[in-house]
């Protein structure tokens, strides 16, 4: 047995499913998950010493690559001064200044510890500010594991939401309306059914939790217009897309102004950090200046703030996003060409430093209903054959891929060459 297999067997006796986040268990592809010993640049090294070109990037944060010296040194320096104070620090102020400079729609920002905390708190704030209860989310979009977000559509487009996890009370789920991504008509229908009850829309500007689905040109502006028409807030969940699709996020790339923005992943440089922020009048409804409560013992943790500040300072340098986009485009076009040469039907979506590919005969993939029609079994075979080639894609057909500026053109070419060999076997 490999060391990963031994570790997984031991982990399953101690940790539910052997992992601390479900997708890591390889349940979407089968087999034994890789146990990682270390990472550097564009590469992961597993417990058995094998190297992999990594397109997961810790599920998004590693836009600069693994073990970046500026981030590592910032963490070491901060740790020497103490790990947690439970009191304000100068670095929190510097971090808030940097975030609000980089994302102009955020007048104020509150630091938290995860993307889930960010979305959960932003929705509570929207409900408190508007004094309304219902929210709109989109089928196939993921905004963390808060109870009111673990909701699927009912039997009809506008039936009350149903929990998609045991432990979520139906009384919570009934306040969540689930619409179809890239379908403005379904959103208008929801507003017309509940014109005085909807507090907010929360949306991934590029849906990264049903692989990678960019918005149609009219979708995000249409959501903004509907929120304005019906007095709801627009929350853009940039946990994945923030500082990755563009420096100021997908909201800048697609030219839409939200009321609130949620951030995570890159904002922590690999440490557990989330944030939410937006219009001053909305944010000032948050405790202690307002009545909407939110708190956290480790929020604004000095180590995490140091890592995040170092990461964002590097990400803001000229050329980072043009490099990221060029590398992602090279990979996306190369995978598509290789698949076509082998006669394998494939759709590839990409924007900024995100990408996704779908084994399907369809011309395009634009929503959850398209995604679930794709050939998951073919993806599983592709994943494992690429893993044998030393290339690590997300172990799920429903997760986006992430590029870093640490990837070289040689890494991309080697990946495409490996894919060409694998497509020939499919």
Swiss-Prot record:
MF terms (GO), sorted A to Z: glutamate-1-semialdehyde 2,1-aminomutase activity; pyridoxal phosphate binding; transaminase activity
Residues with the N6-(pyridoxal phosphate)lysine modification: 265
Catalysed transformations (reactions): (S)-4-amino-5-oxopentanoate = 5-aminolevulinate
Record Pfam families: Aminotran_3
TM region(s), chain numbering: none
Keywords: Cytoplasm, Isomerase, Porphyrin biosynthesis, Pyridoxal phosphate
EC number: 5.4.3.8
Pathway(s) served: Porphyrin-containing compound metabolism; protoporphyrin-IX biosynthesis; 5-aminolevulinate from L-glutamyl-tRNA(Glu): step 2/2
GO BP of this protein: protoporphyrinogen IX biosynthetic process
Keyword Lipoprotein annotated: no
Cofactor(s) the protein needs: pyridoxal 5'-phosphate
Family per record: Belongs to the class-III pyridoxal-phosphate-dependent aminotransferase family. HemL subfamily.
Assembly, per entry: Homodimer.
Full protein name: Glutamate-1-semialdehyde 2,1-aminomutase
Protein encoded by which gene: hemL
